[in-house]
A protein has these predicted regions:
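C-terminal charged capping/lid subdomain of soluble metabolic enzymes
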Residues: 42, 49-129
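Active-site segments that bind and position negatively charged phosphate/pyrophosphate groups
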Residues: 1-68
């Protein structure tokens, strides 16, 4: 799903953040927001990419995969939130980033879950901890 990239483009542009670091800071919040809408995809990611081998419900396995990705980011010195990235967008800046992201596409975005303005704001806010 290219949506995390689109969200990062607006954040990176506003705060002059490199794309990779910005993606790492946004991806966990995006993933936790959309995983239930494409649960089989996140279970495959957890098992096949992150090597999650424990048992549990599909939801538990998906979340373990997301957590494993965050652990990987940290292991290579990458941030997994805006705080770790060293930025603290205001509510007005978050609203502006979401509005610009939606305007650039003209409609709801994403394949894991179609995200509207409120969804984008929620993801940015979740990353801003």
């Amino acid at each position: 799903d290219f949506m995390s990239h689109k969200l990062e483009h607006e954040m990176g542009g506003m705060f002059d953040v490199t794309h990779g670091a910005g993606l790492a800071a946004l991806w966990p919040s995006w993933a936790r927001y959309v995983y239930k809408d494409c649960l089989p995809r996140f279970v495959r990611f957890a098992r096949n990419v992150m090597g999650v081998t424990t048992d549990g419900t599909d939801e538990e396995i998906a979340l373990k995969g997301i957590d494993a990705m965050v652990d990987f980011y940290h292991s290579i010195g990458m941030p997994a939130s805006f705080h770790e990235l060293g930025i603290a967008p205001t509510d007005a800046q978050i609203d502006e980033m979401a509005r610009r992201c939606l305007e650039a596409s003209g409609s709801a975005l994403g394949s894991a879950k179609k995200l509207d303005l409120d969804d984008m704001i929620a993801i940015y806010r979740a990353a801003n901890h």
